[in-house]
Amino acid sequence: MHHFHLLKAARVKKETNDSVNIAFEIPQNLRHEFAFKQGQYLNLRFVFGDEDLRRSYSIVNAPSEGNTELEILVKHLEGGKVSTILNNELKEGDQVEASAPMGHFYTHYHPSNEKTYIGLAAGSGISPVLSNLKEALYQEPKSKAYLFFSNKSLNDIIFKKEIDDLTEKFEERLKVIYLLSREKHFEDELFEGRISAEKLSQLFERFPEIPVQESTYFICGPSEMIKDISGYLKNDKKVPSLQIMYEYYAAPDDDENAEMSDEFKAIPNIESMVTLIIDDDEYSFHLNSKKKSILDQALHDKLPVPFACKGGVCCTCKAQVMEGEVFMEKN
């Protein structure tokens, strides 16, 4: 079970017009539980009456920077209850419920490695990418890193000061390329527009020193960008899949736009008995195959099940098929 603890906001800093950087203080007695790896995320919990809201936010800092604080970035979403509170109402000293860091968006570093790491990020997708690149630079003195970072305008570049400071600190080993999609700021048209397979191909031509096939990639941004870039790297540049890591901030297809799978449409209405074992306690309920998901029904019955995103992204809740077949409603 994922236990939630109250963490105090040590710093609340407006990063851009629509995003805030929050540093949570980790007390001594929780530092073991909240030990983290680069690229992981925090689950935050907010309870409004009967409404239990969970949100996952990537950790921005790197383990090499210390374990006394965890930093996250929260981008304001129109109509988003939690993001509005964190952007507009949270103050230094306020407390927020959080559970221990989770996630698998990272690789392992070793001081003897001499590798190249490529970060490809758009907007708030910079958070886990930056965490990974920082840890690589701190842990592997012979390795190099490139960051290709797309934003709408110069003022929208998240963590620009920190990134620029890092380029000075690691000037021989870190190269940062900003791309702007809605502002003509650079003389070179190559740095206009979003990151795409076509744009990445042009960037590789501009920076021929990048060992494309041998590099390790961290990608985070809109789902279409991730699919486009990862497909290009695997299929066109023959980069091994194990060297391409990506993190979705939302399910790959928006629920309202995704087509219901043919396999799921063909499933008849089936009434099943579901049994959950949670911390050695057993719970059972009836479930119709065409209605609520197991998680939604469990939450409806107020069962203490662990969850975070409810969108098939965070992997807080997982299932293993032991017998029979499973068809995804939307795949």
Language model features with spans:
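Short beta-alpha connecting loops at secondary-structure transitions
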Residues: 150, 330-331
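Local cysteine-cluster metal-coordination motifs and their immediate loop/turn environment
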Residues: 303-328
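A structural signal for short secondary-structure junctions
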Residues: 210-211, 266-269, 299, 308-313
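Ferredoxin-reductase
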Residues: 2-95, 99, 115, 151-153, ...
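Residue-level detector of beta-strand face positions
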Residues: 23, 43, 273-275, 318-320
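Hydrophobic, well-ordered secondary-structure elements that form the walls
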Residues: 244, 298, 314-317
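C-terminal accessory/binding modules appended to enzymatic or scaffolding proteins
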Residues: 269-306, 322
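FNR/FR-type flavoprotein reductase catalytic core
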Residues: 84-268, 273-275, 282
